[in-house]
Structure formats: C-alpha cells, structure tokens
Curated annotation (Swiss-Prot):
It catalyses: L-aspartate 4-semialdehyde + pyruvate = (2S,4S)-4-hydroxy-2,3,4,5-tetrahydrodipicolinate + H2O + H(+). Catalyzes the condensation of (S)-aspartate-beta-semialdehyde [(S)-ASA] and pyruvate to 4-hydroxy-tetrahydrodipicolinate (HTPA). Its EC number is 4.3.3.7. The keyword Amino-acid biosynthesis applies. The keyword Lyase applies. This is 4-hydroxy-tetrahydrodipicolinate synthase. The active site is at 145 (proton donor/acceptor), 173 (schiff-base intermediate with substrate). Pathway: Amino-acid biosynthesis; L-lysine biosynthesis via DAP pathway; (S)-tetrahydrodipicolinate from L-aspartate: step 3/4. Pyruvate binds at residues 57, 213. Belongs to the DapA family. One of its GO terms (cellular component) is cytosol.
Length: 302
C-alpha cells in the first residue's frame, strides 16, 4: 500500500514493480513452461507485483503466438491471483497486433503492452492509427511502449496527446529517456507513466511515474521492490543507497550484454535455469560470464 510519495495512476491495473519476464527455453530450444512457472513464482515471492510477458525481453520476435499464449496461461495459473499480468501484443503489423491483442484478452490478460511499430518507420499518422486500431479491438487497458532506440521512431508529443484521449489507453512505458519532455506530459495526459530504463528508475519516480518495468529486476527483485518502497515512504537516502549498491552494477552489465543475454546468464549463475536465447540473440561467452559473476558479487546478489 502506497503512503503517498509515488503516483497512483494505473497501479491497480499495471502494478508498481514490474518485470519484463524472459521466456525460458529447454536445452533443445523449446519453450520450457515449467521453468516459466518457477521464475514467475520466484519474482512474485520477492516483491514483484506485475509481470510483462511476451515483450522484447521475452524474445517476442522469435517466439510464436502459440508459444506466447502457452507461457501466459501457465504463468496466469501460477501467479495470476498475486500479480498483474500484462501481455505484449505489439508488432510492426497492425493486423497481427490485433490478433495477438484479442488472443491475450481471451486468455485473461489484465492489460496489454503495445510497442511503437518498428523497422517500417511509419508517419505519426500511421503510429496513431496503429495504436488506436489495437486499442479499439479489445476491452483492455493498453500501455504504450515508446522506445525509439529499437523502433526507430518516437511517439511524438502531439501524437501522445491525441492517444491519451483514447478511452482504454491508460499508460506509457517510457524508454525514450527524455525526462524533460515527459515531465509536463505526465501531468497533462493523466496517463500512468512507467520507467522503461533501469538506469533512470529513480529519476522517473521523482517526476511522478507510477512505477517501473524492469529487466534487472529478474536478478534483484527484492532490491527493486525495496527501492520502490523506500522512495514511496520518503526515505530517499535509502532508495539512493539501494540503487547505487545493488542496481547500478546490474545496469552496467546490461549495457555490455543486452537484456536477454544478461538475464539468462545471471539467472543461471543464481541457480535459476531458463535456457539460452534464441538466435539472433546469443548467449554470454565464458569471458562475459566471468565478468558478470563479478558484477553480481559486487551487487550482493550472488
């Protein structure tokens, strides 16, 4: 329960401490549903109150819709009563995104994450039409995912202001990193705002974000939850300490390895097996694993 330092918009739908969960594979590269159940339970047991499935960190480009739905169903059965479940439905194909959105709605998702269409670089008119088509196709809250470093284009301010008027568009996951531009939009739109960049979690909370959607939270879920609680209770010194001592070394490691490679290697070092990434994403090599071991020890999570 919040005590008031953090924004409350959207938390009943999207949660506060979210992790964009990896998709576990077995040694043959097939979906490992049992490992998915175990990982989801581990994260929720350690303070995570929202899981984002089938997102970029879930290797959405290299998993089929059937695989996504199978993992979602298993995770919902495992932790659905204890955490919010947000499903990644966005692609660079509007029709495919609508198909996924409807399938996840039928599967019982609490909300959807829809990324800016990537690679094809549509106009802002196309971005608006894409998001509204997906949102109109389902009766679920939608979180827009603004990540121009991957999509190639941003959601521009005027487009976002128009999208905020769509009834079931309720939130933004911001991985653009432009805090100055976002600060007035958080107030003006009334949308729930979520940090999509672990290195900026504290600044986003200070600007009025409702929570975080994290990658490194896989590796240090309790620390991430503790950071949120400390900030919410007004113990900024404690939040800074957690961020500096535990989370910052993991952010640095992510910068070297990338999210999926980092998480899967780190979880293995922690004794949680989730397999290796699917190509074209590669597993960490021996040298990278040794450096990562040092990072985890420095962070106090190994």
């Amino acid at each position: 329960m919040s005590t008031g330092m953090t924004a409350q918009a959207g938390v009943d739908t999207f949660g506060r401490v979210g992790v964009a969960m990896v998709t576990p594979f077995d040694q043959d590269g097939a979906l490992d549903v049992s490992a998915g159940r175990r990982l989801a339970a581990h994260l929720v047991d350690n303070g995570v109150d929202s899981l984002i499935l089938a997102g970029t960190t879930g290797e959405s480009p290299t998993t089929s819709l059937d695989e996504k739905l199978e993992l979602f169903a298993a995770v919902k059965e495992e932790v659905g009563g204890r955490a919010k479940l947000c499903a990644g439905a966005g692609t660079n194909n509007t029709a495919t995104s609508i198909e996924a959105a409807r399938a996840f709605a039928d599967a019982g998702a609490d909300s959807l994450l829809v990324v800016t269409p990537y690679y094809s670089k549509p106009s802002q008119a196309g971005v608006y039409a894409h998001f509204t088509a997906v949102a109109d196709a389902v009766d679920l809250p939608v979180c827009l995912y603004d990540i121009p470093g991957r999509s190639g284009i941003p959601i521009e301010t005027e487009t976002l202001l128009r999208l905020a008027e769509v009834p079931n568009i309720k939130a933004v996951k911001d991985a653009k990193g432009d805090l100055v531009a976002a600060a007035p939009l958080i107030q003006e739109t009334g949308l729930a705002w979520y940090s999509g960049d672990d290195g900026l979690n504290l600044p986003w909370l200070a600007l009025g974000a409702s929570g975080v959607i994290s990658v490194i939270g896989h590796i240090a879920p309790r620390a991430l939850a503790d950071l949120y609680v400390a900030f919410d209770e007004g113990d900024i010194a404690r939040a800074r300490e957690i961020n500096a001592k535990t989370l910052s070394p993991l952010v640095e490691a992510q910068g070297r390895l990338g999210g999926v490679t980092l998480v899967k290697a780190a979880l293995r070092l922690q004794g949680i097996e989730v397999g290796e990434p699917r190509l074209p994403v590669t597993a960490a090599d021996a040298e990278e694993i040794e450096a990562l071991r040092h990072d985890l020890e420095k962070a106090g999570v190994l």
